[in-house]
Amino acid sequence: MPNDHLKLDKQLCFPLYAASNLLVRVYRPLLEPLGLTYSQYLVMLVLWERDGRSVGDLGQCLYLDSGTLTPLLKRMEKAGLLLRSRDPDDERRVLISLTQQGLEMQLEAKKIPQQLLQKVNVQNIEQLRDSMQDLVEILDKGV
């Protein structure tokens, strides 16, 4: 069939898209007790690794632009999880730092990866994650 390559099940993008949507659904009840959305959880993960990052650095880590991040960070600041401040050395840069509440949330969040593994019983999950990370790096070079 000449249009076989246009079938949905032949596309790389669709299983990635579907898996991403479904994985966010699995995370939702795990994050609910923390009051976090999946996107907010990703921001917290980056800040727990290293606090005091710029919006640009956060965007680079999460593959998001500042137009997407800024409203998300404003909501998180309003919730008391982080603070946004201008870099004293460069007023154009906005720095993001965790509040005490944001820091303390990490203790509760430590349970989430194990809870996820119990819900998503995938063999060779590390191999799958590494393959996806390889794909992200390949795609990032092409953008």
Segment roles from a protein language model:
Residues 55-56, 67, 74, 94:
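Residues within helix-turn-helix
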Residues 43-44:
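Short alpha-helical "packing" element that flanks the helix-turn-helix/winged-helix DNA-binding module
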Residues 24, 74-133:
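Charged, amphipathic alpha-helical coiled-coil/dimerization segments
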Residues 50-54:
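Short capping segments at the starts of secondary-structure elements
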Residues 1-5, 111, 126-143:
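C-terminal regulatory/oligomerization modules of transcriptional regulators
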Residues 59:
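The alpha-helix within a helix-turn-helix
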Residues 1-34, 139:
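N-terminal leader segment of winged-helix/HTH proteins
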Residues 34-39, 68, 99, 125:
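Short helix-coil-helix linker/hinge
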